[in-house]
Amino acid sequence: MADEEISKAFRDLQFKTNETRMRIVQGEQNKKVNHQKMRISESTKRNLIGLNEDLKYYRSVGRMFLLTDKASEIARHETEAKQSKDKIEAIDKQKEYLEKGLVEAESNLRELIQSRR
């Protein structure tokens, strides 16, 4: 009976560690995507700043293009970059939390294995 409980606890801890590792990897992938979005927005903003005010600025929305002005496009790219930066910071905080939980689960797993011997 006790052996079955230990076996079940072992499986649960192992599942938790694997799930946490997968979530950390997924967070890293999301972080890369947001970092790329931030770089694109900042680069586009820098390019827009150097352009003339008299030009027409079009923004693609789905299958159509909207005519906008330079200031609104620069502001839009600034907000996109800020949102991506905020998401990256949130992902970093979540990663720290998950890593703490992973360390705790791994130590519990080690204790369980040692108690089984």
Swiss-Prot record:
TM region(s), chain numbering: none
Cellular compartment(s): Cytoplasm
Annotated GO CC locations: cytoplasm; prefoldin complex
Domain of life of the source: Eukaryota
One MF term in the entry's GO annotations: unfolded protein binding
Swiss-Prot/TrEMBL GO biological process terms: gonad development; protein folding
InterPro entries (alphabetical): PFD_beta-like, Prefoldin
This protein's UniProt keywords: Chaperone, Cytoplasm
Record function comment: Binds specifically to cytosolic chaperonin (c-CPN) and transfers target proteins to it. Binds to nascent polypeptide chain and promotes folding in an environment in which there are many competing pathways for nonnative proteins. Has a role in gonadogenesis.
Oligomeric and partner information: Heterohexamer of two PFD-alpha type and four PFD-beta type subunits.
Family: Belongs to the prefoldin subunit beta family.
Name of the protein in its database record: Probable prefoldin subunit 1
Annotated source species: Caenorhabditis briggsae
Encoding gene, per UniProt annotation: pfd-1
